[in-house]
Amino acid sequence: MNNERYYLLTGAAGFLGTNICMQLLEKGCKVRALVLPNDKSVKYIPENVEVVLGDLTDAPSLEPFFTVPEGCTSVVIHCASMVTVNPNYSEKLMAVNVGGTRNIITKVLNHPECEKMVYVSSTGAIPEQPHGTKIKEVSKFDPCDPKLVVGAYSQSKAKATQMVLDAVSVMGLKACVVHPSGILGPNDHAIGETTGTLLQIIKGEMPMGMQGSFNLCDVRDLAAGTIAAVDKGRVGECYILANKTVTLKDMCDMLHAECNAKKIKFYLPLDLADKIAAGLEKQAEKTGKMPLMTTFSVYNLARNNEFDYSKAETELGYTTRSYEETIHDEVQWMIAEGLIDGNGVTEKPALMTNEQIREGGYMEDIVKAMEHVPALPEIDPEKAYKAIEQNVVETYEKIEDGVVGSYKKVENGFVSAYKKIEDKFVQKFLARKGETTEDVKKRLGRK
């Protein structure tokens, strides 16, 4: 009797999905992938993965994906979602991320041979905590505070996560949730945002960076953690799959050490970057072009990106490798793919070259965006010198006053002590003669 287990994977053509496929195949597992019709990314799915066409938003189209041979069981890893850096509400986003998850839940409940569901959420779905506090798993996601769960994507993932947990408690769904942070590493065939940024840095096409921090995980570690959740994840529980934070400067230094990438010399303060981004967004509304930088991207650097992933380490056996190892492997993958030649020269464009910025008129957008940034005050050298001089004089006077004051206090103390000693001495002398100070004053005719 055939008793194979099928791993049903949505989002199999994505960065995380392809790595999950590869690891499952290495374990000898039977893998089936759900792919949108006419999705060009299907070419990135490894061989030996069964591909089934379907649409998350079309429930009937999912039936072939869930139907497995008689006697077989299945588990679902729901990895697919629509990702966007646009923070504004989108019906399509909600239809895919929330409505699509609802359809997956319904199918799992209608197929008794489906033993488990692992929902791939996001750390962005967890309410942000103040800086200095590590963010931990929560059990309630909806309603979400838009000030703590920022952006339409994160809010859609929060709603979908709550839907999964509600189905567990109300309908008996056997499911758990993983919350990956940002993704980094090799095998990013579609050249996503993070890989594109690294290519820009390697090519020297990023003239300046931004301050702030990321939380990025090696895609292979995220894939392993997600697969582990199938058998080790407790039903109704959530697990953060994250890493230590890293700055853009740290990343640039690692790339410089790995492949002699050009170092970025200037990093925009986040408050200034936010103002420039706001200006670029206003300009983009007029031109219809995507802004080079958004206030949402600045927020993601400025927010608290410290996550506590100890629960996943303890229960799932989740581990993270060093950023240095990930950077090394990703650079080697880029060389193997012909993206770079080993000397930091790329054959494919990263996100956008300087020439493309100029030709597309983006430079004009940046200049116009700067009009929305409050002007910095002009500096008069003579006034600046006088201000410094005045500050020095005032500081000296304070020190001088302090010294003089201390001297006077000491002097007064000596005088007071001397008078006390003198008075005691006189009293003792007169006592020997049987007189008092009053007797002496009368004898001398003094008052």
Predicted regions span which residues?
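NAD(P)H-binding glycine-rich loop region in Rossmannoid oxidoreductase-like domains
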Residues: 39-40, 49-99, 103, 107
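N-terminal Rossmann NAD(P)H-binding glycine-rich loop of SDR-like oxidoreductase domains
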Residues: 5-27
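Mid/C-terminal beta-alpha module of Rossmann-like enzyme folds, strongest
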Residues: 225-293, 309, 314, 324-360
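Substrate-positioning beta->alpha
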Residues: 193, 210-230, 237
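Conserved Rossmann-fold NAD(P)-dependent oxidoreductase catalytic core, especially the SDR/UDP-sugar
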Residues: 91, 99-151
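A conserved pocket-lining segment of Rossmann-fold NAD(P)-dependent short-chain dehydrogenase/reductase
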Residues: 143-148, 197-217, 221
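Active-site Tyr-X1-5-Lys
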Residues: 148-176
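Flexible, glycine-rich beta-alpha linker
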Residues: 126-127, 173-195
